[in-house]
Amino acid sequence: MMTFLCTRSGRRASGVECRIAAERAYFRVRGLPVANMIGWWPRLCPVMSLALLWACSVGAGSDCKSVAIETDSRIAEQTQQRHLQALFDKYGQNGSISLEGLFNLLKGVGLDRIRKVMVHHPGNAHNHTHTHDHTHTHVDKLTAHTHPVTTKKGDMDHSVEKSDPVPKAQPDPASGKKSQSDAHHNLYMKMNQESTTALTTPSYVTRSRRTNRSADYDFTQDHASFSPSQPNVTHSNHTHHDEDTPTHQHDDHDEHEHARASLGCQNASTILQTHGMRKEASLSVKDFSFLCPALLMQIDSKSCIVHEDEDEHSDHSHHHKHHHHHHDHQHLQHPHNHTNGRGQRNTPVYIAWLGGFLSITLISLLALVGVVLIPLMNRVCFNFLLSFLVALAVGTLSGDALLHLIPHSQGHHHHGHSEEHAEEEDSLRPVWTGLTALSGVYIMFLIEHFLTLGKMYKDKNQKVQKRVDLTTEVLESEKLPSLEENDVKIEAAETNGGRALAEEEEVMLGAELYNDIDCENKCHSHFHDTVGQSDEQHHHHHDYHHILHHHHSQNHHPHTHTHRHTHSYSQQHFEQAGVATLAWMVIMGDGLHNFSDGLAIGAAFTEGLSSGLSTSVAVFCHELPHELGDFAVLLKAGMSVRQAMLYNLLSALMGYLGMIIGILIGHYAENVATWIFALTAGLFMYVALVDMVPEMLHNDASEAGFSHYGFFLLQNAGILLGFGIMLIIAVFEDRIQLDLGY
């Protein structure tokens, strides 16, 4: 009734009119004259005013005619059941949701992975630079994570350990305005998808006796719940001050020790674990209802979204105001290889130094392998082994360049996600692209090899047919010139200074009469197979036919010598060069090569253990035949075994220098390692495709005593093995880790 009296003609009555109307109504109900009750007015005025204010406040606040509306719990429960049933029909089976179904649900709402969003910041008055250190660990392991944040404002620089933020909208008591820092910029730290703090339903939802809070809630994280033995743990307590907002602390800190809200991007396994549920068990409708607040908190806090600046991916410039609260900051550790504000990497530097020194030492010891292979250097199996090693080097060099170095130089490297919901397809896309490029190289290698084998097969058939025809003609001829007459003609041609071309061509045609065994024994064009043999072992007739065959294969090269002269010239050339000159050539030529290899290995180990291992395997495989070749050259030059080993080891020291420079550049210089990877990829591709592939294609298999088909299979085995090694390292590089236990 009083609410009705407070309005007149649809408008709100004033205070005086409302009091007068209340008095008149009261006395009329009592049946008393209004004029006789004037004396009661001083006593009734305060009571009626309070009653009127109470009626207006119960109504709807500002409008006295408003009516309070209560929530229909029955409808809310029905709606909840309807939505839950829809979710269970889509992601569950037989009234329950499995772990796989929960993963699909998280994927559907965008909580399956961390998403990066490019944010463009317009002109800002102040710069606030964030640089993140991320390190990924295994699934469901709780570790500490440190975010070094450097704040620059005016001339004041301070470094704090920044916790992972939640969007804040705390009202300002003085001005009535909200802070615009996180609401305007939406800057969120990148969190671990696999390791987070404990997540429970906030107690302000379940406890009615909890004190009222402002619009944003602060959750104090407990340090004691984490293991103190975790590495790289940094705890820092700090207070943010504001001019207008008073400092407050939580009185119920003991409640938060057991009910902390997680602000990180959690996977399905972690959500179940933090709610006290087993991963093997299926979720019922009641169980799933407990997870809904946690999922809503993750969606609301946008903890699975990472914002990157369009111009600088690691530096976010924004104007930032800090709220007043005390935090005990705890973070989760990720093994990404991002750099912090000083340009240093989160990968422990001792791993880079240890891996680099071990790799360079092992590669340098390849010079000693030549000592073991000395007895095999003049045998057929040595050429067989070198052919396989050259093919293996081609596979590892090109595989490392296309599957590892180029993807890393473009920033498409693995971040070490070993959790179930990692974007495995997206992270491996550069690997499959590089594998496609490798398949193109291999297809061209096969085509060229098949063309060579086809041409050799055709020439062989034509040669056999021609030999048969010539033999038939010789047998049918009545007058066949004897071998002595041929020798006379040859001597005449020699005395005429090689002018008798017709006679020489006749002798070359006569050489076709020899069978394959005679040709192999007498008409061999290479002089390396007979190094060290005396002149008495060769007949003049054999020597001369060797000259003619070699002369014909060299297209009448003017510098044609006998086998004896060629060998003596080669030996004399090395002897005139001297040991000092040869040593200088080996140290400078091979040393520069080792320096570039060490530079690549050092930079790769600063990127990670798997990266360093991949590059080390590639360098090892191509250095093995290279070192064996250098060792053989030095021995044939007249050096002793000890001298050859010494000079090879001296050239290997350049690898240590390159490794040291590579680690220093890769670990302390920002964004330089990517350029080193690109340069190394170019060097590896050049060595593989320009130096080693031609050696494989033009290798004379008949010299080593093997068929061309056998060499073809051997070289294919080496190339495919090299490709396979690099592919395995590229695919499983996130699982290659070194844990020394401290």
Swiss-Prot record:
Its main location: membrane. It catalyses: Zn(2+)(in) = Zn(2+)(out). Residues 148-182, 191-210, 220-260, 310-342 are annotated as: Disordered. The chain crosses the membrane at residues 354-374, 386-406, 431-451, 645-665, 672-692, 711-731. Residues 316-339 have a biased composition (Basic residues). Residues 152-165, 239-260 have a biased composition (Basic and acidic residues). InterPro entries: ZIP, ZIP_Transporter. Residues 375-385, 452-644, 693-710 are cytoplasmic. One of its GO terms (cellular component) is plasma membrane. GO terms for biological process: cell migration involved in gastrulation; epithelial to mesenchymal transition; intracellular monoatomic cation homeostasis; intracellular zinc ion homeostasis; T cell differentiation in thymus; T cell receptor signaling pathway; zinc ion import across plasma membrane; zinc ion transport. This is Zinc transporter ZIP6. The lineage of its organism: Eukaryota, Metazoa, Chordata, Craniata, Vertebrata. It is found in: Cell membrane. Disruption phenotype: Homozygous knockout zebrafish lacking slc39a6 develop normally during gastrulation. Acts as a zinc-influx transporter which plays a role in zinc homeostasis and in the induction of epithelial-to-mesenchymal transition (EMT). Glycans are attached at N94, N127, N212, N232, N237, N267, N337. One of its GO terms (molecular function) is monoatomic cation:bicarbonate symporter activity. Keywords: Cell membrane, Glycoprotein, Membrane, Transmembrane, Transmembrane helix. It comes from Danio rerio. Cleaved on the N-terminus before locating to the plasma membrane. N-glycosylated. Residues 192-206, 222-236 have a biased composition (Polar residues).
